[in-house]
């Protein structure tokens, strides 16, 4: 049974979900498939050299509503899951709102974040496939820690191509990588053809998640002893993240609540998708729940992108993904919320947005960090950069609810700042933070590739 103590709602470990949820099976519309270079839907055979068979099944199976969480994965999850939920009464009082604010704290994992939710099953299935190692790309310390810890659990070697442009954040990620024995390579690197090309083209102060993924993907295609892992975007990562939404659903039910608004920041969208997915069936059945994705204003894939097929990586090596995108050639500015610097949004989330189940807004650094500071001073949790964007929109919505005089329930997740990330408020409090706008020339060039398509 769930336990309610003051503002805190906790689940008994026995109540942790034993199956992940596949929302695609319940959707009243078809999510377009990834496409192979041949122009046909990608097949299991084409993915087999890169991914374990269980990951491929989760990726391509649109009919199974649930997937079993393996015993070994569940045991690893139980180190920190279920995670707690809180009623944000102090923030409600600060805002004078009639809204009821509930936030789930995704922390306590070895990575300090929700990214372990998908790193662990990907590493487990990689080991089960008989591979020696796992290779991936990402945006700094949290994913490095997540994949490093997961690989160490199952006796795998690990390599992460980490975005060079993140500078000091990446350096802290490198340090955490050493703890877990990760071989961290600054991307673009000299290890791959993709990396060499991008380094020559853009120089040392460059890099993007798309380039890091391209390097990892290239290495995986050339080394049969490793499997490729991805932190977000693909359907299997969203399925793994549904453990967050499933727990949240049970915690709200324990206090007889259901959300009127579910709000979350978005990079490629798997965590946001995992949070909202268990609440989608009620929306399909008629409940008017709003789902709001919050973008960084310099990486506005939903609010300014186009819906088309585009590669997940900068070099176009990976399958073509149906998504809202700014184009793989877009080079976003180096904002502190590095995980939000991606050129596209997960196919399921993109389809939900296209079908009007999801709304999207974009916020800048200063307004988001200012909102994060208000949350920290009210609730006592120092937030990670991307969580501040969530909180910014939560505060905006809470004030709108106040104006309406209703008592809407708002659900969101936060992750605390961890040592692998930058000190989150220094530049704001020092008065040197500035908002990053989309790099219009890069955006125009990247989106120009899609003119006349479709």
Report the location of each language-model feature.
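Positively charged, low-complexity intrinsically disordered leader regions
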Residues: 2-131
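A short, small-residue-rich loop immediately preceding and capping a beta-strand
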Residues: 118, 126-165, 258-271, 386, ...
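Alpha-helix C-terminal capping segments
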Residues: 121-131, 145-157, 178, 276-285, ...
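Active-site/ligand-binding loops adjacent to catalytic centers
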Residues: 205-232, 281-284, 288, 293-381, ...
């Amino acid at each position: 049974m769930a336990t309610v103590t003051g503002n805190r709602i906790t689940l008994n470990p026995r109540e942790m979900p034993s199956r992940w949820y596949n929302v695609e099976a319940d959707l009243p519309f078809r999510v377009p498939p990834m496409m192979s270079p041949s122009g046909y839907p990608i097949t299991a055979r084409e993915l087999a050299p890169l991914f374990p068979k269980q990951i491929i099944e989760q990726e391509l199976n649109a009919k199974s509503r649930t997937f079993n969480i393996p015993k070994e994965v569940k045991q690893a999850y139980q180190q920190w899951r279920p995670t707690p939920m809180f009623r944000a009464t102090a923030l409600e009082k600060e805002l004078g709102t009639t809204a009821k604010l509930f936030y789930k704290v995704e922390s306590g994992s070895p990575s300090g974040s929700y990214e372990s939710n998908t790193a662990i099953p990907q590493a487990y299935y990689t080991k089960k496939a008989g591979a020696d190692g796992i290779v991936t790309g990402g945006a700094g310390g949290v994913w490095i820690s997540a994949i490093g810890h997961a690989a160490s659990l199952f006796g795998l070697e690990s390599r992460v191509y980490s975005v060079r442009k993140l500078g000091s954040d990446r350096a802290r990620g490198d340090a955490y990588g050493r703890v877990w024995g990760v071989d961290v390579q600054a991307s673009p690197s000299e290890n791959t053809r993709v990396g060499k090309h991008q380094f020559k083209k853009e120089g040392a102060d460059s890099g993007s998640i798309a380039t890091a993924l391209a390097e990892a993907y290239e290495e995986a295609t050339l080394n049969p002893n490793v499997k490729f892992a991805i932190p977000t975007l693909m359907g299997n990562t969203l399925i793994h993240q549904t453990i967050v939404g499933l727990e949240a659903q049970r915690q709200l039910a324990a206090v007889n609540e259901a959300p009127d608004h579910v709000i979350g920041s978005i990079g490629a969208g798997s965590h946001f998708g995992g949070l909202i997915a268990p609440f989608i069936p009620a929306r399909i059945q008629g409940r008017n729940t709003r789902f709001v994705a919050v973008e960084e204003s310099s990486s506005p894939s939903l609010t300014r992108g186009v819906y088309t097929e585009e590669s997940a990586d900068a070099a176009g090596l990976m399958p073509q993904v149906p998504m809202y995108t700014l184009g793989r050639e877009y080079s976003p500015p180096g904002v502190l919320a590095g995980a939000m610097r991606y050129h596209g949004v997960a196919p399921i989330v993109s389809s939900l947005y296209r079908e009007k189940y999801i709304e999207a807004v974009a916020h800048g650094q200063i307004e988001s960090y200012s909102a994060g500071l208000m949350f920290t001073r009210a609730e006592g949790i120092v937030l990670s950069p991307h969580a501040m964007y969530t909180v910014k929109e939560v505060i905006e919505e809470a004030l709108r609810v106040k104006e309406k005089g209703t008592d809407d329930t708002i659900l969101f997740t936060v992750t605390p700042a961890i040592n692998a990330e930058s000190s989150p408020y220094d530049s704001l409090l020092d008065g040197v933070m500035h908002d990053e706008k989309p790099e219009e020339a890069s955006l125009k060039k990247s989106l120009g590739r899609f003119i006349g398509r479709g």
